[in-house]
Amino acid sequence: MTLASAEKEMAGVLTFFQKETRGFRTGKAHPALVETVTVEVYGTTMRLSDIASISVSDMRQLLISPYDAGTVSAISKGILAANLNLQPIVEGATVRINVPEPTEEYRREVIKQLKRKSEEAKVAIRNIRRTFNDRLKKDDNLTEDAVKSLEKKIQELTDKFCKQIEELAKQKEAELATV
């Protein structure tokens, strides 16, 4: 494992954390709320983003325009089945979703999930650091000074990525508090 590969793995953890938390409902309409919803169409299960365009019509409303108008009812059922606390409204060949303002209880629950997920991401980053350091110590070709230098660099990377995760979590928490 090289320093560059460790950094790439850490960046992957950060990206995964961003994707996981993007779907948290903050009270503002955002396509990420429903794009991963699975829908039963054409005899198979597909992601909503693969069968429809999802747009924001205003701050609290999503507009879903299926590529095939025959999938409207399946999309509505898929959204209801996803238990997102969202009520789809079928309007001809489109589905409209009014995003309700989150309740205080919901906000507390999402903040708990957010903190748990951010801690899991930081643990994953620290595990990458530990694996890197373990491999360094087993490498007989490196001098003690080289090992110390690389350990310092991997620690700097770890701190950088953990800080980015904390900042993203704080931003998301602030979004939840201001809506």
Swiss-Prot record:
Keyword Iron-sulfur: no
Compartment(s) of residence: Cytoplasm
Classification via Pfam families: RRF
Domain of life: Bacteria
Protein task: Responsible for the release of ribosomes from messenger RNA at the termination of protein biosynthesis. May increase the efficiency of translation by recycling ribosomes from one round of translation to another.
Family that this chain belongs to: Belongs to the RRF family.
Protein name per its UniProtKB record: Ribosome-recycling factor
Organism of derivation: Chlamydia trachomatis serovar L2 (strain ATCC VR-902B / DSM 19102 / 434/Bu)
